[in-house]
Amino acid sequence: MQYVVVIGGGHAGVEAAAASARLGVETLLVTNNVMNIGEMSCNPAIGGIGKGNVVKEVDAMGGVMALAIDRASIHSRMLNRSKGAAVWGPRAQADRKLYKCAVLELLTKYEKLSILEDHITDLIIENDRLMGVVGEKTGTIKCSAAVLTTGTFLNGIIQTGSERVEGGRFGEKASQCLGNTLRRHFKISRLRTGTPARLYKDSINYSALVEQPGDSPPIPFSYMNTEITVPQVSCYITHTNGKTHEIIRNSLKFSAIRNGVSARGPRYCPSIEDKVVRFAEKDSHQIFLEPEGLDSELVYPNGISNSLPKEIQEEFIRSIAGLEKASVARYAYTIEYDYIDPRELRSTLESKRVKNLYFAGQINGTTGYEEAAGQGIVAGSNAAGAGLIISRSEGYIGVMIDDLITLGTNGEPYRLFTSRAEYRLNLRSDNADFRLTEKAYRVGLVDEERYAAYKKKYDTFHNYKSKLNELSTTPYELAKIEGISIAQDGVRKSAWNLITQPLFVFEDLLRIWPELSEVPEKYREMLTINARYEPYLLRQEQDVKLLRNNEKVVIPSNFDFGAIKSLSSEVIEKLEAVRPETLAQAKRISGVTPAAIVSILIHLRRLGAEGSQPFPKDLDQALRQLN
């Protein structure tokens, strides 16, 4: 009989346990504290650029996160809305209490899922096969598979200035016994992350801040929801200043992360100490003041995580506009913890060393709630025997897992970005259900209700698309309509052809074919996005094939990687350090993504690089859309 044990009740553990239970397998979720299931340990928000796509992918496969945030969303925004849909990033601020309540309520509806409050101290491994786990209070628990989603708890050390305590999170003890067990079986390294202080709301001078309202109406994350019913509130923006930076610079010798903590933190979510040192030329850094809940007295100051002593935290916080009289409810800290080398995992997230043992979340070297959830749904599904593998072309979850198991983390927490995906034109936040719901349904992750909703949406979309392809007119007829300009080439054009053009909007089609007014607003946007991207998706596939044929392209010794705007600072830093001689060498550098290689190839081709093969006609123009 199958019996899956999930260790840890964070975002990875929640999705792993829910996925296993949805597949009809008896599942046990073991957590240190039932009331902390779904806890947002750091910022009270879900989503963002790249991250929001993962949440939509988890939802497309029947997951929990999107449903939970829709019940707790108090401030919703679509990031990058002014850019192409491929880089849109849905994001929502959460009411912490509402989010945890929603997660727990959703989990309790699974008949096959039980929850146990205990500390897992050991693993039972025989002949390189997991046979069970050992609980501090429960003792031996036999199982067919287990998923480790321990977050920052493995040998966690919390530091604020010179204060150093063992802990997996504020107020919770670390998992030392389990951490020591893993050290006997796996290659273990250390990472760190941090969190800022929490401030009392009534001590903040909001008149000195810039208000940032959310989108109206707020857009749900889940494909199963049509609206957000939770009251909405604003966030606020302020900035550090010269005085703030001076206080921090003069106090670096007291910072834990500058003195003694050797583990590396997240590159793209640096502490304020790192910002002041790494970006010394900057006069200020932006801070978002995010409410922790509708009835919470606390505010999360996003952008000033640190490990400075408490008195220095108060001093630099009060040097910031609007925070001159700020009262600290809880001080910032950094936490150092164990993680495994994810290159020792299969694409199912099963260990190569120990059969039936799966890993998901920060234990794999990632950072972020969303990355954890994406790994959790894959690990939990496969622990239950689903055989679920998501490819790089199917989802950001596939990009992330492939990056982890082939490249590793390069010693720093892994964060997902749209730039990591060579297929990003298709991996959009608007089409995750079209990409993954059918696949998830086939393995049993998606129930009949969700699948029926997906099929209705899919069929409706394609019916409307067919109608747009059937309707056609001539440039001559279009010229008679005021405000519509099109080349008089004599070629008959369908409504679908017209909407592919950037200057055409769906409302223009209504002036030509009034009968299209029956198309609902959400389908108008879907049709427009798909029409605009369709020609480039075909060329994107050509681009990926071309890349495989250009691995021997020579990279000049004086090539300026920094001139390629689409490359991240992380990738540029690694390329400059190694100075690869060919594209093949560049591909083997840990952290240099396939998307980055594509960008390099484009620029090399324009320079007439030695060994590069000719691009198909018009491909240069198409590839520019990827950068």
Curated annotation (Swiss-Prot):
<feature type="binding site">
    <location>
        <position position="175"/>
    </location>
    <ligand>
        <name>FAD</name>
    </ligand>
</feature>
<dbReference type="GO" id="GO:0005737">
    <property type="term" value="C:cytoplasm"/>
</dbReference>
<dbReference type="InterPro" id="IPR020595">
    <property type="entry name" value="MnmG-rel_CS"/>
</dbReference>
<keyword id="KW-0274">FAD</keyword>
<dbReference type="Pfam" id="PF13932">
    <property type="entry name" value="SAM_GIDA_C"/>
</dbReference>
<dbReference type="GO" id="GO:0030488">
    <property type="term" value="P:tRNA methylation"/>
</dbReference>
<keyword id="KW-0285">Flavoprotein</keyword>
<feature type="binding site">
    <location>
        <position position="120"/>
    </location>
    <ligand>
        <name>FAD</name>
    </ligand>
</feature>
<dbReference type="InterPro" id="IPR044920">
    <property type="entry name" value="MnmG_C_subdom_sf"/>
</dbReference>
<comment type="similarity">
    <text>Belongs to the MnmG family.</text>
</comment>
<dbReference type="Pfam" id="PF21680">
    <property type="entry name" value="GIDA_C_1st"/>
</dbReference>
<dbReference type="GO" id="GO:0002098">
    <property type="term" value="P:tRNA wobble uridine modification"/>
</dbReference>
<dbReference type="InterPro" id="IPR040131">
    <property type="entry name" value="MnmG_N"/>
</dbReference>
<feature type="binding site">
    <location>
        <position position="362"/>
    </location>
    <ligand>
        <name>FAD</name>
    </ligand>
</feature>
<protein>
    <recommendedName>
        <fullName>tRNA uridine 5-carboxymethylaminomethyl modification enzyme MnmG</fullName>
    </recommendedName>
</protein>
<feature type="binding site">
    <location>
        <begin position="265"/>
        <end position="279"/>
    </location>
    <ligand>
        <name>NAD(+)</name>
    </ligand>
</feature>
<dbReference type="GO" id="GO:0050660">
    <property type="term" value="F:flavin adenine dinucleotide binding"/>
</dbReference>
<keyword id="KW-0520">NAD</keyword>
<dbReference type="Pfam" id="PF01134">
    <property type="entry name" value="GIDA"/>
</dbReference>
<keyword id="KW-0819">tRNA processing</keyword>
<dbReference type="InterPro" id="IPR049312">
    <property type="entry name" value="GIDA_C_N"/>
</dbReference>
<dbReference type="InterPro" id="IPR036188">
    <property type="entry name" value="FAD/NAD-bd_sf"/>
</dbReference>
<dbReference type="InterPro" id="IPR004416">
    <property type="entry name" value="MnmG"/>
</dbReference>
<comment type="subunit">
    <text>Homodimer. Heterotetramer of two MnmE and two MnmG subunits.</text>
</comment>
<dbReference type="InterPro" id="IPR002218">
    <property type="entry name" value="MnmG-rel"/>
</dbReference>
<feature type="binding site">
    <location>
        <begin position="8"/>
        <end position="13"/>
    </location>
    <ligand>
        <name>FAD</name>
    </ligand>
</feature>
<dbReference type="InterPro" id="IPR047001">
    <property type="entry name" value="MnmG_C_subdom"/>
</dbReference>
<comment type="function">
    <text>NAD-binding protein involved in the addition of a carboxymethylaminomethyl (cmnm) group at the wobble position (U34) of certain tRNAs, forming tRNA-cmnm(5)s(2)U34.</text>
</comment>
<dbReference type="InterPro" id="IPR026904">
    <property type="entry name" value="MnmG_C"/>
</dbReference>
<keyword id="KW-0963">Cytoplasm</keyword>
